[in-house]
Amino acid sequence: MFNFHTYSVDEVPCLLNVDTADILPSYPEHVKLSIGLHPWKVDESWQKCIAMIRKGASREDVWAIGECGLDKVHRETLPLQMEAFRAQIILAEEVQKPMIIHCVRAFDELLMLRRELETTCGKEGREPQPWIIHGFRGKPEQAKQMMTKGMLLSFGHQYNLETIRFVFTSSRPFYLETDDLHLSIRHIYEQVAHHLDVDVSRLSLLCDPRTSLFCRHA
């Protein structure tokens, strides 16, 4: 059982989202990190934040860049969000680590940036790093659109039942998370296992990013 995106240290293996200002010298062995600039926190000083993230991005226990992305609820900072997100895309490619994506009402822009990255990587003869959209609640059609562009999905407590069934039958990796909720990740695994009519043990194997996304760390 793996908690793919959380803001608090879990008892099970997890990917802990940390602020670079609060990052500790070390963490328990089962805790791995993701670091990035959340779109809600983007302001005129975003470049300083990216510089701090860059310093920590090469740590062995940092497995992903993020969460980062775009959020049109905070439309007033969207131009800055785009700049900060592009900078983190470049960083993720440099350190060869996946990205944890926060996307709210900005999927067209997200797809545009993914196409830009695919074009750049194609010219260089390499594959882009995976992007994982966390807390995905979209419909199956939107999920298919994202997956076609090489993106993966992570689901929290709330999700579209048809979508998670579609992803399950697609044989593509997907992940489960608590995000910032004070819930047990086991509760989410049990809920999803019930909806998919599978054993929790099987679901735990299917949703373990160490065997699909972070293979080099396993």
Which residues does each predicted region cover?
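Mid-domain alpha/beta scaffold segments of enzyme catalytic cores
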Residues: 1-218
